């Protein structure tokens, strides 16, 4: 999903078998979040005495990414700046697209490249340049389909309604069931 945070998740037979940690620090850089950080420099920053624990967390998630560079998390604004000739915005967008593509392509290794389709969702999927840049870099793995917008709340509400009205059942996964072999 391409939004303020970005998750890249691999599914097999309806189950998630691998994913980046979209809230815990393992993510591509986003409009609001930094990506992988150089460890020693991060340790230095944490122990500099300049920032509290909460401030460091906010720098990593909330005030990182585009917010740190441009003071906004609005991808449309950054795209517009690039189109208007802002070199920093153009470079940031190229790096943004490349970083996401690298995360997507790395998931293919888990299934030896046997990927049926790559789905792009979220608000960022409205961006033609974002989508075309990602597609160019990952379509060698699998076809790319785009579903722009954020559907999480709608999906939860609809499925909740279906359950309450008796048109669907709550799925329960056996915690003791053997995990699928990700190397098959």
State the predicted function of each range.
Residues 115-135:
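Glycine-rich phosphate-binding loops at beta-strand->alpha-helix junctions
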Residues 128, 132-158:
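Conserved phosphate-binding/catalytic loops in two-lobed NTP-binding clefts
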Residues 148-184:
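Structural signal for terminal/edge beta-strands and the immediately following C-terminal loop/tail
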Residues 58, 62-113:
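Adenine-nucleotide phosphate-binding core of ATP-dependent small-molecule kinases
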Residues 12-19, 133-142, 167:
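A glycine- and small-aliphatic-rich helix-loop capping segment at beta-alpha/alpha-beta transitions
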Residues 13, 17-73:
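Glycine-rich phosphate-binding loop plus the immediately following alpha-helix
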Residues 1-3, 32-34, 146-154:
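Active-site nucleophile and cofactor-binding loops and adjacent substrate-binding regions
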Residues 1-27, 171-183:
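Phosphate-binding/catalytic loop of phosphoryl-transfer enzymes
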């Amino acid at each position: 999903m391409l939004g303020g945070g970005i998750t890249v998740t691999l599914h097999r037979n309806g189950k998630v078998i691998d994913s980046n940690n979209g809230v815990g620090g393992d993510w591509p850089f986003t409009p609001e979040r930094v990506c992988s950080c150089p460890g020693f420099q991060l340790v230095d920053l944490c122990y500099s005495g300049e920032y509290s624990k909460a401030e460091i967390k906010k720098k990593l998630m909330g005030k990182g990414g585009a917010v740190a560079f441009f003071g906004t998390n609005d991808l449309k604004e950054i795209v517009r700046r690039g189109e208007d000739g802002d070199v920093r915005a153009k470079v940031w967008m190229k790096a943004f697209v490349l970083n996401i593509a690298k995360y997507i392509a790395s998931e293919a290794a888990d299934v030896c490249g046997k990927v049926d389709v790559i789905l792009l969702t979220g608000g960022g999927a409205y961006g033609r340049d974002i989508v075309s840049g990602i597609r160019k870099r990952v379509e060698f793995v699998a076809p790319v389909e785009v579903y722009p917008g954020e559907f999480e709340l709608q999906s939860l509400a609809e499925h909740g309604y279906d359950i309450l009205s008796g048109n669907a059942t709550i799925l329960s996964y056996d915690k003791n069931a053997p995990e699928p072999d990700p190397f098959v």
